[in-house]
């Protein structure tokens, strides 16, 4: 069975905070080892409560199978914390996501100058103009422009970077298959074509 299924199982368990998942990974080494551990072994993990350990009794891999099939159908790549392609800069933050879903070409975050441009959704026309200029200037200078896909400053920075022919990456909080806001559908497609 694919080790990736166990990563998806772990990330899809409801009621576990990401910090709990990371503590379990530090203790056991892999999601597969967590999957097959008994409750007594799980309780030896620092900071794990009995309630949290009981959540790990759910050994259904159905949701993981669904996610794998959907990602394959849509052409999405799945990266785990243990994958060589997982960005080291992201891995070294306090609370790194266990799994990344990637649409497009994963930028070489650790090798490129990556600059995040984020801001308010409810911005003035001046704010939009400045964000587009920032995105354009950064991309023209060779930087990878990273932002959310939210309306306002985030979208403006990405549009500016794309206008400059630069590389972009959008970090989405709502899943790859959900474009929000809907008016950014074309921007979503353009960002995936110019990065991830």
Describe the predicted segments one by one.
Residues 1-84:
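Short, small/acidic-rich helices and loops at N termini and domain boundaries
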Residues 3-4, 81-196:
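Glycine-biased, small-residue-rich flexible motifs in mid-sequence functional cores and linkers
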